[in-house]
């Protein structure tokens, strides 16, 4: 059908993203689905999706998000629900920048000079309000771009969010993301590595 379209439309069709459900991608989606349906408890399972650059990690996450977005909107038209929240780790992984990225992802206004405690409370309240069931943090390897103390603070933030929200956290990144998580003993045993 696309071959019968005008040149511009065919070119646009060829350049568009395509989902190619190779075996490892399908099994990763299945694992994400298991986490999505996990009942809330004190210590939730987390996942660390590891793969080389241009290996389809972000495409898998976007497909997972799309698969859950329309259901939430259709069933709750009067209240916005965001069951799968996807945020990218900032290039400089400070706690305040991460909260700012999360708030922007949720479409929330933010005071430019808000303190971390304020950002934290607003973010937690919003994530609960939109009934987030899973938090995906893409480009987690960016954590290594920070100085040692900034890196530790960011990794502590991941542990805090997991404890506070009681939802699974999925980290996505290159092997450097695995090295970052392994640098914290408590986080290492909370994140199940999944190699693509």
Question: For the regions a protein language model found, what residue spans apply to each?
Answer:
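A short helix-turn-beta junction within AAA+ P-loop NTPase domains corresponding to the substrate/partner-engaging
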Residues: 182-196
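Post-Walker A helix-loop "phosphate-sensing" segment adjacent to the P-loop in P-loop NTPases
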Residues: 66-77, 108-110
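Conserved phosphate-binding/catalytic loops and adjacent sensor/switch elements of nucleotide-binding enzymes
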Residues: 87, 91-103
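Conserved catalytic segments around the Walker B and adjacent sensor/switch elements
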Residues: 71-90
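A short, basic N-terminal segment
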Residues: 1-45
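Walker A/P-loop nucleotide-binding motif
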Residues: 41-63
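A short beta-strand-to-loop transition that corresponds to the Sensor-1 phosphate-sensing loop
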Residues: 139, 171-177
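Mid-core helix/loop region of P-loop NTP-binding domains shared across ATPases and GTPases
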Residues: 1-6, 10, 14, 29, ...
């Amino acid at each position: 059908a696309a071959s019968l379209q005008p040149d511009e439309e065919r070119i646009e069709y060829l350049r568009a993203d395509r989902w190619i459900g190779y075996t490892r991608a399908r099994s990763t989606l299945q694992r994400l689905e298991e986490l999505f349906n996990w009942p809330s408890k004190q210590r939730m399972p987390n996942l660390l999706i590891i793969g080389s650059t241009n290996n389809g990690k972000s495409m898998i996450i976007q497909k997972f998000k799309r698969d859950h977005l329309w259901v939430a909107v259709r069933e709750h038209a009067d209240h916005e629900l965001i069951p799968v929240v996807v945020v990218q780790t900032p290039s400089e992984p400070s706690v305040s920048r991460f909260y700012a990225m999360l708030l922007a992802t949720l479409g929330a206004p933010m005071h430019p000079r808000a303190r971390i405690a304020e950002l934290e409370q607003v973010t937690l309240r919003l994530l609960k309000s939109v009934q987030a069931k899973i938090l995906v943090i893409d480009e987690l390897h960016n954590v290594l771009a920070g100085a040692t103390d900034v890196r530790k603070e960011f990794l502590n933030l991941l542990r805090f969010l997991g404890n506070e929200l009681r939802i699974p956290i999925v980290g996505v990144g290159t092997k450097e993301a695995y090295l970052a998580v392994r640098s914290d003993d408590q986080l290492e045993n909370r994140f199940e590595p999944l190699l693509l």
